[in-house]
């Protein structure tokens, strides 16, 4: 017989919507059967709530979703991990919207990017909205929160090319702008301000995603999640 969750456990799960509580406990929450099942392969399961051990009302109390999906899990966060990729990396400089971060993680998973460098002011990857938006991709993509300018400086000194999307960059669809042999770091910036000046000065290969038609009025910028997908798609296309 499955033991019913206690009131204390339900209250604890609810408290993990706050970052300070997730950090203090070293855990995070995921919702939805598919997302939970994907994450079980990569993270230690601490608590599982299903209709077998929690009522619908109790699941609603624990959920951060408007329409709870019936399965809620608490997982232990990863320990600090080393960067394992020898191919492309993505670096995020102040991406603050949880939905954008979740979309970028899912996009990186699709295009085979296994490590993302994040500035300290990038959104928390264990925020419930981020976890939900990744659709389980967090199991396969590792995020590293670092002093981003310092890390990128070290990588540049090691000879890694640093790509960044800038309005003054080169049209990335022009020949030889993106190499066939791919390694390096693709840097994406903050939703409102783009790439910070300190990081911008480190970029070795500025890229431009051109608007169409050329020289006609258009939107001021692209959503950072969409821009990341466009850049990664072009890199992988050149690598085929």
Label each residue range with its predicted role.
Residues 110, 125, 132-137, 200-240:
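Structured adenosyl-cofactor binding patch, chiefly the S-adenosyl-L-methionine
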Residues 28-30, 44-51, 74, 161-167, ...:
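Short, hydrophobic beta-strand segments that form beta-sheet elements in well-ordered domains
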Residues 83-169:
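RNA substrate-binding interface of SAM-dependent RNA methyltransferases
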Residues 54-79:
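Glycine/small-residue-rich loop that forms an oxyanion/phosphate-binding "nest" at active or ligand-binding sites
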Residues 164-219:
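Active-site/ligand-binding-proximal alpha/beta "capping" segment
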Residues 1-4, 53-57, 141-151, 207:
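Short acidic-hydrophobic, aromatic-tinged amphipathic segments that line or gate anion-handling sites
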Residues 1-50, 122-123, 149:
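Boundary-proximal intrinsically disordered activation/regulatory segments immediately upstream
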Residues 51-62, 87, 204-205:
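Active-site regions of enzymes building and remodeling cell-envelope glycoconjugates
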């Amino acid at each position: 017989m499955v033991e019913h969750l206690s009131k204390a456990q339900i209250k604890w799960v609810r408290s993990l919507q706050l970052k300070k509580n997730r950090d203090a406990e070293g855990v995070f929450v995921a919702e939805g059967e598919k997302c939970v099942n994907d994450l079980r392969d990569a993270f230690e399961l601490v608590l599982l709530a299903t209709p077998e051990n929690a009522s619908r009302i109790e699941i609603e109390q624990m959920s951060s979703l408007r329409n709870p999906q019936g399965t809620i899990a608490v997982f232990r966060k990863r320990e600090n991990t080393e960067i394992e990729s020898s191919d492309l990396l993505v670096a995020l400089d102040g991406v603050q919207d949880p939905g954008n971060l979740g979309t970028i993680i899912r996009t990186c998973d699709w295009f085979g990017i296994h490590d993302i460098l994040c500035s300290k002011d990038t959104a928390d990857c264990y925020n419930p909205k981020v976890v939900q938006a990744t659709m389980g991709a967090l199991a396969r993509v590792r995020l590293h929160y670092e002093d981003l300018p310092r890390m990128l400086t070290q990588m540049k000194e090691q000879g890694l090319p640093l790509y960044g999307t800038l309005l003054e960059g080169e049209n990335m669809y022009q020949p030889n702008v993106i190499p066939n042999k791919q390694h390096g770091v693709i840097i994406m910036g903050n939703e409102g301000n783009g790439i910070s000046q300190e990081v911008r000065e480190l970029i070795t290969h500025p890229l431009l995603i051109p608007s169409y038609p050329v020289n006609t009025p258009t939107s001021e910028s692209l959503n950072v999640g969409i821009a990341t997908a466009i850049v990664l798609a072009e890199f992988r296309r050149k690598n085929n």
